Amino acid sequence: HFGFVNMNIITLQPDNEHIIQQAAQLLVDAFREHWPDAWATFDEATKEVHEMLERERICRAAIDDAGNLLGIIGGIPQYDGHVWELHPLAVQPNMQGQGIGRALIEDFEAQVRSRGGLTITLGSDDEDNMTSLSNADLFENTWEKIQNIRNLKGHPFEFYQKLGYVITGVVPDANGIGKPDIMMSKRVK
């Protein structure tokens, strides 16, 4: 099920400082190349991880046999728990492509279902000209542009599509002029 990687997926607990520190560093490292403003500093990332640990949220971590963090996923309930926002998902850059992200998402979907959730949504920013939606006028022929989206630089939207997520909209200029957020959703009920 997990490819070549031997791992366990656990609920990250607020007292697990060792993994919390690794998670903060992972957020900085995993987003640095294409989303440098996401968590520019370790302190910002540490604050995000602590927010992920709030009681009503989901926070799951993939850990290898030696106790090292391989990836992390978080979720925020919305619409009275009918919808959950997947935020964030990060996998160690040198471990990507080995099924860790897929396993975290499948686990997250099960967590959402067990809480009565119906739909998962996510936003996947395009801050680095990674898709044909970058620098496009998304106020004109919006759905045609979404329907004809092209992946120019390995943007993760195709990863999510393979797991059953569909593009349900965009937020034009979410990260500055010509830098949209691509909204995706999946029914999990």
Language-model region placement:
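Conserved beta-strand in the GNAT
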Residues: 61, 67-77, 83-90
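Conserved acetyl-CoA binding element of GNAT-fold acetyltransferases
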Residues: 82-93, 121-125
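C-terminal "cap" of GNAT-fold acetyltransferases
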Residues: 141-189
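Conserved acetyl-CoA-binding loop-helix of GNAT-fold acetyltransferases
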Residues: 91, 97-110
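Feature marks short, surface-exposed loop/turn motifs that line or immediately flank catalytic pockets
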Residues: 30, 79, 93, 126-130
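Conserved N-terminal entry element of GNAT/NAT acetyltransferase domains
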Residues: 2-21, 186-189
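Active-site rim helix/loop that mediates acceptor-substrate recognition in acyltransferases
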Residues: 24-61, 74
